[in-house]
């Protein structure tokens, strides 16, 4: 999905491939500002010191990793399952003059190609919902982050049970958006604990992230003509429909989590 859709998506949404954070719960700031703000909200939940090495799980095209490196003066290794994303992220690091500090590789979060305790901290910015086995990915993170190291996660959740036609919407999000691990905050916390992590904070920021759904649908509708040639009419319309329906579902939520390796 990301091999084919990253470029068209980034063209209309911006290269931060994640939801925005609007403090007021209404879209009173541009998308680019709100997506940077979401990165900053996650940054605020990361404990890492200058010179330390942080793993970025599901790095997209590298924008959050570069912000992390610049803000905290850390080294970052980003991984993604998408080779074109890794190539773009590496080019961005090069352009930013940070290619020694920030590197990107192809890799699968559920089977990390790193030794035990290789990192001081890790974050996953809107990537763990893609995991077919979230506990397995979290166990891998626990393994590669040293004892005492920090983990920060931003991700989609459902704030309650879903009934009737809304179940089809969630199914469409799973199928079309690759959202394989979708559940409540309690499910997330249970998965973190099952992976052996100490949970520090689980904050429901559904209200602050929700304008993203409206904005996403709006941008995709407005830019439909630019998206169709690369993504295809069927895919674009399916995406718009799913976003509009999710926007009508009060259970469509978002969480910020922080944890520590014991
Ligand atoms: C919604 S994007 C977020 C990208 C980036 N964190 C950002 O905020 O700009 C999800 C990312 O997760 C990556 N991803 C999906 N499944 C993965 C897996 N099994 N292992 C590693 N990365 C994965 C995708 O390639 C993509 O980069």
Language-model features: locations:
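A short acidic, Gly/Pro-enriched loop at the edge of an enzyme's catalytic core
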Residues: 110-121
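Class I SAM-dependent methyltransferase SAM/SAH-binding core
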Residues: 53-55, 64-111
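Short, glycine-/aromatic-enriched active-site segment of Class I SAM-dependent methyltransferases
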Residues: 157-179
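N-terminal, positively charged/glycine-rich alpha-helical extensions of SAM-dependent methyltransferases
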Residues: 1-22
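Short alpha-helix
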Residues: 180-196, 202
């Amino acid at each position: 999905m990301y091999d084919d859709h990253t470029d068209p998506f980034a063209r209309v949404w911006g290269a931060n491939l994640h939801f925005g954070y609007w403090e007021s719960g209404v879209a009173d700031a541009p998308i680019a500002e709100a997506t940077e703000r979401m990165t900053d909200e996650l940054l605020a939940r990361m404990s890492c010191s200058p010179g330390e090495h942080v793993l970025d799980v599901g790095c997209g095209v590298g924008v959050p990793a570069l912000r992390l490196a610049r803000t905290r003066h850390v080294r970052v290794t980003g991984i993604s399952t998408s080779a074109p994303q890794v190539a773009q992220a590496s080019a961005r690091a090069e352009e930013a003059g940070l290619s020694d500090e920030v590197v990107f590789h192809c890799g699968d979060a559920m089977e990390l190609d790193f030794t035990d305790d290789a990192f001081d901290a890790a974050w996953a910015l809107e990537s763990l919902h893609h995991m077919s086995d979230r506990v397995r990915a979290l166990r891998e993170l626990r393994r590669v982050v040293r004892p005492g190291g920090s983990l920060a996660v931003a991700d989609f959740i459902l704030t309650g049970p879903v009934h009737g036609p809304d179940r089809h919407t969630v199914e469409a999000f799973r199928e079309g958006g690759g959202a394989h691990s979708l559940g409540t905050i309690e499910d997330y916390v249970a998965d973190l604990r099952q992976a052996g992590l100490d949970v520090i904070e689980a904050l429901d920021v559904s209200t602050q992230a929700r304008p993203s759904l409206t904005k996403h649908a709006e941008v995709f509708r407005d830019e439909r003509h630019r998206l169709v040639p690369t993504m295809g009419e069927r895919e674009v319309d399916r995406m718009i429909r799913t976003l509009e329906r999710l926007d009508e579902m009060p259970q469509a939520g978002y969480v910020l989590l922080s944890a520590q390796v014991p």
